[in-house]
Amino acid sequence: MEISVSSVTFSLAVVVVSWWVWRTLKWVWFTPKMLERSLRRQGLSGTSYTPLIGDFKKMISMFIEATSKPIKPTDDITPRVMPHPLQMLKTHGRTNLTWFGPIPTITIMDPEQIKEVFNKVYDFQKAHTFPLSKILGTGLVSYDGDKWAQHRRIINPAFHLEKIKNMVHVFHESCSELVGEWDKLVSDKGSSCEVDVWPGLTSMTADVISRTAFGSSYREGHRIFELQAELAQLVMQAFQKFFIPGYIYLPTKGNRRMKTAAREIQDILRGIINKRERARESGEAPSEDLLGILLESNLGQTEGNGMSTEDMMEECKLFYLAGQETTSVLLVWTMVLLSQHQDWQARAREEVKQVFGDKQPDTEGLNQLKVMTMILYEVLRLYPPVVQLTRAIHKEMKLGDLTLPGGVQISLPVLLVHRDTELWGNDAGEFKPERFKDGLSKATKNQVSFFPFAWGPRICIGQNFTLLEAKMAMSLILQRFSFELSPSYVHAPYTIITLYPQFGAHLMLHKL
């Protein structure tokens, strides 16, 4: 009997190990090679599959090399920010094949194909290649199918234009505080002063999202921002070791810190939400901040169709990740580009003076700023907050002339498309806001060639929030200062989650 039990145990162990080996081989070798053969037969050009790591190690090494030194302010930023996708474009054409680990990734630049990918949200779903990124927050941008539709429906009221108009006074309050700080710095030096505007802009946009999202709980909100910023840095460090199997599970100092910071964020958010729910139960009027509107909208859902506390916590994290990061990088690149193009800075200031004079900017006036809108669109074209979007296919799909098997990813290289001479003309790399004088449709020739906030049904729900906040900030800055690049300015666009200035943005501010 003892021998029989040992034999059975051994046999089971062999079966389990064999199954594990087979699954691993299938994931690492057989499935990728099968997908590669299918794509090659259709004439798709690209790199050959390297077991497990694909092109990932090369991508990282090229990125590290490209970002090891700054560039001139007039240089094309693409070789620094997206060296590997740019090389693939030059070598293998506008539709090409790369490998993110064992996952084949097809880059497309054709506007009609991009439009199809954006429109078919149930077929081309969000890619979840890097599990550790979930620690920063999931929420609306990472959901698919019915859950995405449910969350979009609940969150929509918080970003309705009428609700955003009610937040303009918060935009003004936070932006005025920053301008006041800069004014004091300049006054202490006389009439001009060198200022790294990047830290101030990140702090200001964090203050805006803290106040608009959490109202009276904005101080706790500031702590969330600090932790989210730290987490983003730690995730990027871990991302560079992604090709090492199991690295994210090792008890490294960075990995341990990530888990601790993530837990602290969860605890703060749970406390804020629970406090709001207790206040509502005791009969207090709902707050008009984003969280208050979200809670009220969620309350109006039928049984089983609302969000859990955990769901709301993820959406609150997303308020920070998407709302704060997007606006701060839009503002910093706007100031950098207007420092280089004094004629457009003067035109923007003249428009602000015509609309507001020296008075406080209001919603109605902000919506009249045509030159400012043109400038912001051009900044978003040349320096999109997110330089690349990905989608995943889970079943066989047709896309143009290609038949794509399930298991393939689609890459939408925002930065490459935005600077593509075939779509935007030979001056695609130049700062020319006049492209947008007749609106987006005319500028893009009704093609999907401009998508800094994505496009279609999944277009960023907070884009109006971002643009209105940016207009408020730039109006106040232009009323008080002129600015130019400082001699110590170092041009080094760098991407972790969003495209930001690696060494800050040192400008000379001149008091008007």
Swiss-Prot record:
UniProt cross-references to InterPro entries, sorted A to Z: Cyt_P450, Cyt_P450_E_grp-I, Cyt_P450_sf, Cytochrome_P450_Monooxygen
Pfam families: p450
Claim: Acetylation is one of the keywords in the record: no
Organism name: Arabidopsis thaliana (Mouse-ear cress)
Annotated protein name in UniProt: Cytochrome P450 72A14
UniProt keyword list: Heme, Iron, Membrane, Metal-binding, Monooxygenase, Oxidoreductase, Transmembrane, Transmembrane helix
Any one GO cellular component localisation term in the record: membrane
Cofactor needs: heme
